Amino acid sequence: MNDRIALRRLDDMHCHFRVGSLLKEVLPFTAQYAGRGIAMPNTRPRAILTGEDVVWYRDEIKRALDEISHQHPFEPLMTIEIRDSTTPQMITEAYRAGAVAGKVYPLGVTTNSDEGLRDFDSETISESFRAMRDAGMLLLIHGELDRERTLVTKREEVFLPTLLMLAEKFPDLKIVLEHVSTRVAVESVRQLGKNVAATITAHHLCLTLNDVVGYGIQPHHGCMPMPKDFDDRDTLVAVATSGDPKFFLGSDTAPHLREKKECAKGECGVYTAPVLPQVLAEVFEEVGCLDRLGDFTSRFGAEFYGLPPNDGTISLTKSEWIVPEQI
């Protein structure tokens, strides 16, 4: 790696900004290097389900931005959560309120998915997906299914037939398989049409299941989908650094209070926002593909979403530093 590199300001296509005081604490880390960030809708106590919710959450984020000192503009890209009760009218109203995408959490697979989608093929949901297609909204999917006698490490693979069904049924709907974690998911996205893409996180480029449970329980590495085998991680690194435009950054940065992680039943999520560009630069440098980092972080996601490139750049300097243990 050169002592200094410049990147166009990032597009982080998967961010958990939270609400309230935690929002104000974590938002500055992403805003310092990103021009845009997709705001995930599975917030609590108020989930983002309607156009009214979109307006409320965007205003919350912008108020938090107004309270921090940042030199460059940051745009939150809003989403709604798609549930079995979501209707085409709700889709239309959310789009008019500024939502660029709808996010599906299958029932019970991750944080705050207790009211997640049960039936991907119901007529009501199909009508909602058609409304998203007609409006130009994207469908973002947490691609796991919790089935009887299915290990947590197999949930993503079990979901892939559903992805295939959706891609074939809605060829004009842009679909993003979020935070892919397995070789088979990467292969599936590559084989499907140009309407299907995937995000990759920094932590899935670095961790395996051993880093979660192999050397004692390490709760701050626990997330959904779980990191998998070495072959899966190697595949993710290879495709992220390959220059394939179907794969781009979505950090899934997910902050939790420390006591919510270090407990008998800890929350899932890895908080990477404070170190995201640095970790990605190390990964790309290790495989000799630092020249492709900007495409992964700042080009391919924008192109898939139909957005112009961000203005401005950030600079990374190669030097030793100590990551704070907590913020």
Positions of predicted regions on the chain:
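Short helix-capping segments at alpha-helix termini
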Residues: 63-73, 168-170, 193-194, 289
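Divalent metal-dependent hydrolysis catalytic cores, especially in the metallo-beta-lactamase
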Residues: 12-13, 26-52, 70-83, 99-112, ...
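His/Asp/Glu-enriched, well-ordered alpha-helical/loop segment
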Residues: 242-309
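Histidine-centered catalytic micro-motifs
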Residues: 9-20, 139-145, 200, 251-253
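C-terminal cap of metal-dependent C-N hydrolases
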Residues: 311-327
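Histidine/acidic residue-rich metal-binding segments in metalloenzymes
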Residues: 90-104, 113-249
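Short, acidic/polar
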Residues: 20-27, 85-96
